[in-house]
Amino acid sequence: MKTLIARHKAGEHIGICSVCSAHPLVIEAALAFDRNSTRKVLIEATSNQVNQFGGYTGMTPADFREFVFTIADKVGFARERIILGGDHLGPNCWQQENADAAMEKSVELVKAYVRAGFSKIHLDASMSCAGDPIPLAPETVAERAAVLCFAAESVATDCQREQLSYVIGTEVPVPGGEASAIQSVHITHVEDAANTLRTHQKAFIARGLTEALTRVIAIVVQPGVEFDHSNIIHYQPQEAQALAQWIENTRMVYEAHSTDYQTRTAYWELVRDHFAILKVGPALTFALREAIFALAQIEQELIAPENRSGCLAVIEEVMLDEPQYWKKYYRTGFNDSLLDIRYSLSDRIRYYWPHSRIKNSVETMMVNLEGVDIPLGMISQYLPKQFERIQSGELSAIPHQLIMDKIYDVLRAYRYGCAE
């Protein structure tokens, strides 16, 4: 990360896409996409996904590292080209507890990530805990971030410190996307970004972390990009020019969250304006969902009724029976809920792919389709971009490859924007 940031600060148009997903097919796609390039791949886990207690994936940071490395070995991607990051590391998972208890767990969380070899650490202490004022004072956020940084430094080896980098910032979107419809977003004021940096510098120095400050590579701000279930707030470069100019006088770049669904031109403009770390998550699993839904429609027409997976019906039934991952995010009417379950840009389906019933139905669908020749006309109907690549000889009409290429479409836009 430090080398890439140095190249950007030296004037090169270069950025990096941060893949924020724990889905094995998304991780496989991210690694396979860059297998034959010289680029490194940044893969991040969030604190609610992966933590010392397992998170909702059931994985600790060490488990997640091995999970990613196993996929890398399968793909033939060198492990040393992978950068592992920890996102929203702080009290996010324990906001219902008092600050002392939440921070105690947060300290152990950060230590677990660093011990597991994660080298990009987002110190996110921006959320209020039980009994805290809402919002927290910037000084409190910075002081708690310094506590987390001290924890990271205390367990990092000398070798790790050479690679270790930190991201700070208080204007952080809700992990997992917005819960309600949005029409506009508040772009961070330069004064607030400067205050974030100033308060963190003061808090770090007070804890004897002057050297660690040199490892702070980025600050999270809101450049004016966001999405909800059916709306996308597109990047307007002219609105972020003050931010773009201010960061040029620092050693840092910006990290932009929720960049999913922007245009490839917007990614290029974001990187030009020093938002050099572009985080993406739901757009990748949304592309995965699109591919699976398309293949399910193809299966419906090609496979005898008694042998079909019933994949779409299984997904719908499981999500309606177990609504905990979407209920507070989606609309309440039955028909509206079904539309959101299937097609929402916030893609809450991503939490359900590991469910045994859904996983088994998808596997059945894949086996069914691997045993037949899919007519080109059907691929043109349901996966038109993939049809074009099959026609040009770039792609084969194999279900797994079709899914990979659908995810590649998202990564292609980021590659254009990051322009290495």
Curated annotation (Swiss-Prot):
Instruction: Enumerate the Gene Ontology biological process terms.
Output: D-tagatose 6-phosphate catabolic process; galactitol metabolic process; phosphoenolpyruvate-dependent sugar phosphotransferase system
Function summary: Component of the tagatose-1,6-bisphosphate aldolase GatYZ that is required for full activity and stability of the Y subunit. Could have a chaperone-like function for the proper and stable folding of GatY. When expressed alone, GatZ does not show any aldolase activity. Is involved in the catabolism of galactitol.
> Record's Gene3D superfamilies?
Aldolase class I (3.20.20.70), putative tagatose 6-phosphate kinase domain like (1.10.400.20)
Q: Which PANTHER family match?
A: D-TAGATOSE-1,6-BISPHOSPHATE ALDOLASE SUBUNIT GATZ, N-ACETYLGALACTOSAMINE PERMEASE II COMPONENT-RELATED
Q: What is this protein called?
A: D-tagatose-1,6-bisphosphate aldolase subunit GatZ
Q: Which UniProt keywords apply?
A: Galactitol metabolism
Subunit structure and binding partners: Forms a complex with GatY.
